[in-house]
A protein has these predicted regions:
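Cofactor-cradling patches in redox/metallo enzymes
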Residues: 82-89, 94-165
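Long, low-complexity, intrinsically disordered polar/charged segments
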Residues: 54-69, 134-138, 144
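Surface-exposed alpha-helical interface segments used for non-catalytic interactions
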Residues: 12-13, 41, 80, 84, ...
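Short glycine-enriched loops at secondary-structure junctions
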Residues: 16, 70-73, 99, 154
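Alpha-helix N-cap/loop-to-helix initiation residues
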Residues: 32, 74-75, 126
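Short acidic-hydrophobic, aromatic-tinged amphipathic segments that line or gate anion-handling sites
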Residues: 167-169
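Glycine-rich active-site/cofactor-binding loop and its immediate structural neighborhood
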Residues: 60-96
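Long amphipathic alpha-helical segments
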Residues: 1-57
Length: 169
């Protein structure tokens, strides 16, 4: 920071990239779950140090985002990174945490008058819950009032299109 390096670049090109590399090492069986958890702790410490230096974009006009990890999944590294980016973008972020019951996503979109709903999962076994949430939004007449963003390792454009999400990461 003192040398002129942007905090966001440090997060994206340093911490996120490092976590991605750790993930690949885990896939290649060079890292164990304990190694990934240590890397995640280091990444969170780095984000905490850089977060106060992020330039906040105040163009979001007080928009609200609801974010959480879908029911049945407790992997929240990606969710926490997206949360930081949304906050940096000027959004009010309502973080539901991990292993969030499907109905809670819909209830929170309604009670918070959310502009964006972000759902995350790292597991293929919990992906279908995202589609259930989108259908529940339709049933309550909320789907056209909120942008739905889904993300996680198993998520593809095909899946996002299939369930009616607006975008994926």
């Amino acid at each position: 920071i003192d040398g002129g390096y942007e905090a966001l670049d440090g997060i994206m090109e340093g911490l996120v990239d490092g976590m991605g590399r750790a993930g690949k090492m885990y896939e290649e069986e060079e890292y164990f779950v304990s190694d990934i958890l240590l890397c995640a702790d280091a990444m969170y410490a780095g984000v905490d140090m850089l977060k106060p230096h992020l330039e906040q974009d105040l163009t979001a006009d007080e928009k609200t985002a609801v974010i959480g990890v879908i029911e049945g999944d407790t992997h929240d590294i990606g969710k926490n990174l997206v949360k930081t980016m949304l906050e940096t973008g000027g959004y009010k972020v309502v973080d539901l945490g991990k292993d969030v019951p499907l109905k809670q996503f819909v209830d929170s979109v309604e009670s918070e008058h959310a502009d964006v709903l972000c759902m995350s999962t790292l597991m293929t076994t919990t992906m279908d819950g995202m589609g259930t949430v989108v259908n529940m939004l339709k049933e309550r007449g909320l789907r056209d009032k909120v942008k739905v963003m889904i993300g996680g390792a198993p998520i593809t454009q095909i899946f996002a299109d299939k369930i009616g999400a607006d975008t994926f990461s």
